[in-house]
């Protein structure tokens, strides 16, 4: 383990390496980190000696890793290391004040609770349940980074925790607009991120929960119920518990949705990053729940604030990554189907009840959970990202997860044909597609 014992490797001198203008070595002292923002060009990096990790995953010695443009990360060492970089960064600097000791202490406590749960009898649902950790905090407080660390440290010790991502604005497991869960069987790759092959994905279709709050809550509840059923038949996963990432909207409805998530997933540990006010509110409102610990943690000084335009750009890159790969190494397949071969639906809108059925003076309100068919010849579908639902009937769409996504590149009304990109060739797993407000202008 990177934090399991002192390094026996001798330190190296820092500074530029002769013979290359873009080759640079940095010596890190114990419990310090190298914070990096990659420029518009990829960056190569390796550990020359010592041990170091990124997002809780230890880097192999002497092996170059390539990091994509615009990626932001920190290389941390517990006992000292020398890092070598090849390329130009937007910025890079060392820092010796980090919250990592407090983070690893949280991991140690969670590990003890997992061991207790594993040793307990499976007949006792409460004691056999491992920690269900939910990470909350404002925008750009380091929530995603902390969840990666906790998951990687747990996997390094042989656990198989479940990662749950409720942040529809960015999306860690798959494209934005989704909520998802995935078992983490090994420390996360610092470049590739979360595995998608075993992910359970529900499509919300929007980048913010305020577009349809009731739908967001319904999908969160559906995901929680499915995971609960899986835990019943898998005591090891149950003992490993969950780590849940949340959105950065913590005021008004956003705060209500945080409480809804804490309650729906039966969270036992609430980690609050970067805001005293939120910690105080949650501590007070959860005071009556003796089985819930609310813990305040400092955010890292390396967290980078992102403006609205940067967030939008990040969403577009995530969609591009889904179809083309992180380094554009994939080639999606263009498929053309007749309008009659597919059915597209939106969730929300439509009258909930006719006026004649309402009390005098009342007005009809829209039903946020109504599944409404969409005309495929609607030009609004052009450049849309559509989810391929596992539902067999339209009324099962909300309760069904999705198999993947397609991107609409052309709608030919005259020929009644729709052309879309898909990650794999052949017929789609289902003819039922789900649309939201998520769109993407391809620039590859």
Curated annotation (Swiss-Prot):
Q: Where does ATP bind?
A: 33, 72, 140-145
MF terms in GO? ATP binding; polynucleotide 5'-hydroxyl-kinase activity
The molecule here is called Protein CLP1 homolog
**Any Pfam family hit:** CLP1_N
Q: Its biological function?
A: Required for endonucleolytic cleavage during polyadenylation-dependent pre-mRNA 3'-end formation. Functions in gametophyte, embryo and postembryotic development.
Keywords of the record, alphabetical order, are: ATP-binding, mRNA processing, Nucleotide-binding, Nucleus
Q: Does the keyword Cell cycle apply?
A: no
- Main subcellular location of this protein, as a coarse class: nucleus
Subcellular localization, per the record? Nucleus
Family that this chain belongs to: Belongs to the Clp1 family. Clp1 subfamily.
One Gene Ontology cellular component annotation held by this UniProt entry: mRNA cleavage factor complex
Its subunit composition reads:
Interacts with PCFS4 and SYM5. Forms a complex with cleavage and polyadenylation specificity factor (CPSF) subunits CPSF30, CPSF100, PCFS1, PCFS4, PCFS5, CPSF160 and FY.
Gene for this chain: CLPS3
The UniProt entry's GO biological process terms, in alphabetical order, are: flower development; mRNA 3'-end processing; mRNA processing; phyllome development; vegetative to reproductive phase transition of meristem
Tell me the superkingdom of the source.
Eukaryota
């Amino acid at each position: 383990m990177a934090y399991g014992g002192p390094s026996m490797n001798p330190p190296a001198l820092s500074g530029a390496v002769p013979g290359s203008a873009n080759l640079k070595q940095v010596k890190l002292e114990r419990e310090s980190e190298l914070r990096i923002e990659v420029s518009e060009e990829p960056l190569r990096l390796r550990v020359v000696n010592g041990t170091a990790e990124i997002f809780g995953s230890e880097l192999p010695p002497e092996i170059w890793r390539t990091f994509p443009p615009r990626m932001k990360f920190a290389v941390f060492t517990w006992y000292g290391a020398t890092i070598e970089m090849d390329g130009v960064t937007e910025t890079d600097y060392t820092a010796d004040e980090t919250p990592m000791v407090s983070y690893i202490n949280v991991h140690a406590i969670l590990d003890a609770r997992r061991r207790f749960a594993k040793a307990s009898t499976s007949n006792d649902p409460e004691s056999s349940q491992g920690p269900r950790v939910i990470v909350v905090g404002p925008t750009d407080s380091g929530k995603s980074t902390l969840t990666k660390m906790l998951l990687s440290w747990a996997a390094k010790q042989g656990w198989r925790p479940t990662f749950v991502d409720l942040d529809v604005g960015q999306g860690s497991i798959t494209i934005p607009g989704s909520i998802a869960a995935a078992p983490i069987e090994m420390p996360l790759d610092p470049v590739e991120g979360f595995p998608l092959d075993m992910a359970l994905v529900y499509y919300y279709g929007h980048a913010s929960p305020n577009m349809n709050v009731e739908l967001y809550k319904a999908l969160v509840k559906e995901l929680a119920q499915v995971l609960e059923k899986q835990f019943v038949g898998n005591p090891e996963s149950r003992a490993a518990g969950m780590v849940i990432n949340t959105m950065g909207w913590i005021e008004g409805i956003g705060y209500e949705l945080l409480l809804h998530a804490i309650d729906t997933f039966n969270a036992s540990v609430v980690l609050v990053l970067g805001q005293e006010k939120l910690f105080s509110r949650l501590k007070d409102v959860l005071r009556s729940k003796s089985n819930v610990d609310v813990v305040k943690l400092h955010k890292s000084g390396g967290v980078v604030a992102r403006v609205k335009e940067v967030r939008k750009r990040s969403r577009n890159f995530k969609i591009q990554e889904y179809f083309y790969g992180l380094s554009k190494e994939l080639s999606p397949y263009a498929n053309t189907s007749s309008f009659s071969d597919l059915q597209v639906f939106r969730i929300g809108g439509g009258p909930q009840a006719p006026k004649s059925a309402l009390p005098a003076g009342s007005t009809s309100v829209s039903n946020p959970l109504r599944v409404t068919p969409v005309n495929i010849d609607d030009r609004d579908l052009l450049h849309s990202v559509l989810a391929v639902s596992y539902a067999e009937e339209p009324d099962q769409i909300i309760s069904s997860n999705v198999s993947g996504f397609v991107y609409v590149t052309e709608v030919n009304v005259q020929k009644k044909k729709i052309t879309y990109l898909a990650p794999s060739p052949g017929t789609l797993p289902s003819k039922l597609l789900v649309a939201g407000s998520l769109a993407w202008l391809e620039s590859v």
